[in-house]
């Protein structure tokens, strides 16, 4: 409707659709992420709503029946998906420590 107001000659055809994803913000897996990020970076994580349009996530969550959590490591100044996107070693190093901590904690729960 908005596009039609701007230019009535434009025709929009939807070729596909993905279901949106919304992660949980509490529970044992989220608590494990909090501890892992603290171990990797020395700070509490900031939970933000990003990545909800990654189509495979809804399918994975339904198939695996477990919470899907993202541990994004990029910072706003990294220009995520921009022409000059970069990722600094400090984030990579902290991220590796966080993931090792997270997977070790999950393994200990089994």
List each language-model region with its residue ranges.
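An extended, acidic, His-containing surface patch that forms the Zn2+-binding/catalytic region
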Residues: 6-110
């Amino acid at each position: 409707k908005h596009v039609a107001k701007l230019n009535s000659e434009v025709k929009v055809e939807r070729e596909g659709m993905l279901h949106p994803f919304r992660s949980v913000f509490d529970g044992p897996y989220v608590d494990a992420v909090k501890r892992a990020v603290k171990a990797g970076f020395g700070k509490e994580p900031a939970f933000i709503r990003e990545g909800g349009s990654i189509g495979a996530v809804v399918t994975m969550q339904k198939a695996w029946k477990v919470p899907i959590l993202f541990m994004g490591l990029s910072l706003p100044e990294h220009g995520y998906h921009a022409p000059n996107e970069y990722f600094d070693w400090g984030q990579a190093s902290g991220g590796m420590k966080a993931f090792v901590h997270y997977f070790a904690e999950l393994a200990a729960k089994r």
